[in-house]
Amino acid sequence: MVAPNTNADTLSAFLANFCTAGQPPHRTPDAGELSRTAQIQPGVYFTLEAPFVRILGLYSNALEDPGVISQQNGKRPSYPNISNVQLTFLNAALKRIKKEKFAGAVLIAVHHPPYVAAHPSGKTAPQKHNANALMLEDIDSACEVAGVWPHAILSGHAHNYQRFTRTQDSRQTPFVVLGNGGHAPIQRLTGKGSPTLRTPMPQPSLSNGKDSVVFENYDDQDFGYLRVIADPSQLRIEYHPATDGASAKTPDDFVTVDLETYSLVHYQAASATA
């Protein structure tokens, strides 16, 4: 794994709370009254390996908008003070997946969302975050070179839940925004006087000209969490609103990806006796 730039000012708090590998277990002042120790991930971008899933975590820097993982040379805006080291890492991680013939689910996780919903009326809540097309171009370029594409992309940042399906070539890829895990206030996707936002809704403004993007579902009312299930043949992502409590665990939204075909399918639940 490529080492992070630990001198970057934007990383100091994150490193102190999440990147403490090699240190004894300890709580940081940021934990407040929580009985939780600092995490031990190796850096601000990383590969997390598990039997049926490989997660590539990217660091999209500390701007409110946009998310940035490179200098974005030759594009507007560009960021000459940001290293391209994450592109080196991402290319190497994807090529390793190809070389090792990893057959499980490949997830890319990045804080800033590549997509956020666009209302056809043009009326949106003023605090709504923007999509990050240039960041997605960087990810796409690395995937194209390696010949490896993610089965899903997970993000946060926007304080609500949104799910999109991107169709490109024969691949159907869920893009999930889960930014309503507890940070208040929840951000509404429509402003005062806007018509009801109904899904599914095509999002032509999010297309790069080679794909199609559909806004599938959302929750801008509740806090919630994701449950991600992977097995040798499928990846299932569930959204659960916190208002359901501990006794109701049927998801309000879900999507399943066939790992071999990259198509959205009906989930084949494992037998209770298996």
PLM features per residue range, with description:
Residues 157, 179, 232:
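Residues that line or immediately flank small-molecule/substrate-binding pockets and catalytic motifs
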Residues 59-60, 109-113, 156-158, 240-242:
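Short, well-ordered beta-to-alpha junction loops that form the rim of enzyme active sites
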Residues 97-119:
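Short acidic, glycine-rich surface-loop motifs adjacent to enzyme active sites
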Residues 202-274:
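A short C-terminal boundary segment appended to hydrolase-like catalytic domains
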Residues 107, 152-153:
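Hydrophobic "anchor" residues on beta-strands that sit immediately upstream
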Residues 108-110, 176, 235-239:
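A short hydrophobic beta-strand element
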Residues 1-101, 125-134, 138-152, 160-215, ...:
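Extended active-site neighborhood of metal-dependent phosphoesterases/phosphodiesterases
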Residues 66, 116-120, 245:
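Gram-negative outer-membrane beta-barrel proteins
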